Each structure stands twice: as structure tokens, then as C-alpha cells.
């Protein structure tokens, strides 16, 4: 796991908040990444209209990453839509498919598609 001082980059865009997640998500950092995502969600409160998790730069993700996405979905509840951007040929997309998370969270090829869908 590569040490990153900031577990994710947060950008507020028109109509959504975009979080770019780290290059690797596994047991060593999944809790820290979730805490950062939850902090961004709570900081925006009722202003949060949609959340996009950008996994296009994530090269490695195990089942902890899938659990993170599912935990974020449950944190948001039905009020705030969650969308995920993941490269079609990347590991994160495959993990989301194999774990069944993709049935509950829409996955798009890139962040632009996720924002506009």
C-alpha cells in the first residue's frame, strides 16, 4: 500500500460532490478512506445532492473496497444518489461485479458519465 497523506481528493461540482479515491484500497486503508468519505458527506449535510466515487485511478482494490462502497451507500440512504466511476477493464470494477455491489450502485466508465447520467 502506498502511503498517501490524504486518503481522497474532494471536489464540489455543480450538482454533485466528486471524491477521487486512492490508487489502492485494501484492509490497510479502507477504514481511513471511509472516514474521509463520511467526513465529506457530513460536512456538506443537506447541500449534498449526489456523491460520485471516482475509482478510475484505483489500480488495486480487494473486498474491503467493495465493502467501503456499500458502507457509503448505506450512509447516504435513499436521499442522496451514489454513483461510482470505474475503468471498464480495471480491478475495482471487477471486484464490484464479483461482490454484487454493482447491483445496488450504478457504475460508469468515468466520472463525467457518472455525473451526467
Q: Model-derived features: where do they sit?
A:
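Short, conserved active-site loop motifs that form the nucleotide-linked donor/cofactor pocket
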Residues: 16, 105-106
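A charged, well-structured terminal subsegment
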Residues: 106-117
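STAS-typified acidic loop motif
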Residues: 2-38, 57
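Short, solvent-exposed coil/turn elements at secondary-structure transition points
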Residues: 24, 88, 111-113
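Amphipathic alpha-helical interaction surfaces in cytosolic regulatory modules
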Residues: 27-105
Amino acid at each position: 500500500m502506498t502511503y498517501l497523506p490524504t486518503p481522497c481528493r474532494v471536489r464540489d461540482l455543480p450538482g454533485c460532490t466528486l471524491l477521487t479515491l486512492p490508487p489502492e484500497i485494501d484492509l490497510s486503508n479502507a477504514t481511513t478512506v471511509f472516514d474521509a468519505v463520511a467526513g465529506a458527506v457530513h460536512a456538506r449535510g443537506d447541500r449534498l445532492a449526489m456523491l460520485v466515487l471516482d475509482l478510475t485511478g484505483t489500480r488495486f482494490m480487494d473486498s474491503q473496497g467493495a465493502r467501503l462502497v456499500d458502507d457509503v451507500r448505506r450512509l447516504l440512504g435513499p436521499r442522496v444518489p451514489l454513483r461510482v466511476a470505474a475503468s471498464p477493464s480495471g480491478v475495482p470494477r471487477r471486484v464490484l461485479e464479483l461482490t454484487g455491489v454493482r447491483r445496488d450502485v450504478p457504475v460508469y466508465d468515468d466520472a463525467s458519465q457518472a455525473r451526467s447520467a
